Every structure is written in structure tokens, then in C-alpha cells.
């Protein structure tokens, strides 16, 4: 699915299931960016993306550039969340092993972002790259769980906000976090 979304108070739900190639993005992550207005542009939007592979061929990808404020974005690849007030992305079904990639670029404030990457079997990796620039009080909750390597790269260039990151079980764990801003940013890494 390749898309751009403009406007205020939109709701977008994408649910992808299958054995290969689940992708929600604009072309090559930073494709058009809708003339730099962002792939998602407009305030107060609710975006929910759920990707499930049922005995993998290693592809779950999500990539967006968001230029607007006060959005709720939930990205669930295979399963997880459980907290920053979960909106039920549990799962942990048998035989789910997609390779999970999230690339998210926020140039805005007051966004609530929840991301989950889980592999129930197999040895697929998890990769998340998150940037927040300009705008304040972005809250990000990320959980990577089970099998394969877990790589998380986060750059926070905003004031305030809470960042909660969890990497669990199996494989090598790497988290690179770069924080900069005038006011506090709460960070929890487990």
C-alpha cells in the first residue's frame, strides 16, 4: 500500500495478512512526501496499521513522514504493545515470522506513537528507526520481542515527551538513542 493522507480528523486503518510483502509506505520510505507536506499531513488523525505474516517470507515494512500534530499512530507488526495505554495489538500467534521494519519521521508535536514488532517463531529480525524534529511532547512507545536481532535507532530533537523502548528475548539487541532539547524528555529502555 502506497499512500499520502491530507486533512484533519481522518481515520486510517490498514490490516495486512499473508505470506509475503506487507508494505505500507510512500515509495522507498521518503518518496514524494507530498511536496514536503508529509505523507501524513493534517492534525488530529488516527492511523492504525497491523501487519501479520502467517509463516514468513520476511517482509513487514512501514515508512512514513508525518508533518502534522496531535496524531495517534499505532503500528503493529506481528503483535505486542502492552502499554502506553495499549490499544490491543497483542497476538503472539504461532508461525508468525516476518522481518519487521519501521521507519518513521515526525516533524510535529503532541503525537502519540505506539509500535510493536514480534516474531513468534523463525529467526526474523526487527528494525526500527524513529526521528522526531521540531514540535514538542511526542510520546513514543516501542516494543521489539522474540527471535532474531533487534535494532532500534531513535533521534529525538524535541522538548518534553516520554520515550519507552523495550527489546526482549533471543538475538542481539542494539539501541542507539540521540536526545537533544531544552526541556526534559523521559526515557525508559529495557
Regions found by a protein language model. Name each.
Residues 1-190:
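Low-complexity repeat regions of mature extracellularly deployed or surface/particle-associated proteins
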Amino acid at each position: 500500500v502506497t499512500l499520502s493522507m491530507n486533512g484533519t480528523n481522518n481515520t486510517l486503518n490498514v490490516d495486512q495478512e499473508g505470506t509475503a510483502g506487507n508494505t505500507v509506505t510512500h515509495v522507498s520510505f521518503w518518496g514524494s512526501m507530498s511536496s514536503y507536506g508529509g505523507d501524513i499531513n493534517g492534525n488530529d488523525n488516527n492511523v492504525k496499521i497491523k501487519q501479520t505474516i502467517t509463516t514468513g517470507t520476511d517482509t513487514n515494512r512501514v515508512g512514513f513522514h508525518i508533518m502534522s500534530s496531535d496524531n495517534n499512530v499505532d503500528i503493529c507488526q506481528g503483535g505486542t504493545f502492552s502499554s502506553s495505554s495499549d490499544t490491543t495489538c497483542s497476538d503472539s500467534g504461532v508461525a508468525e515470522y516476518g522481518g519487521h521494519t519501521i521507519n518513521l519521521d515526525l516533524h510535529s508535536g503532541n503525537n502519540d506513537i505506539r509500535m510493536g514488532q514480534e516474531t513468534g517463531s523463525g529467526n526474523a529480525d526487527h528494525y526500527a528507526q524513529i526521528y522526531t524534529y521540531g514540535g514538542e511532547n511526542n510520546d513514543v512507545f516501542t516494543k521489539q520481542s522474540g527471535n532474531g536481532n533487534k535494532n532500534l535507532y531513535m533521534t529525538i530533537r524535541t522538548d518534553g515527551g516520554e520515550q519507552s523502548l523495550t527489546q526482549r528475548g533471543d538475538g542481539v539487541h542494539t539501541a542507539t538513542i540521540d536526545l537533544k532539547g531544552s526541556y526534559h524528555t523521559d526515557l525508559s529502555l529495557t
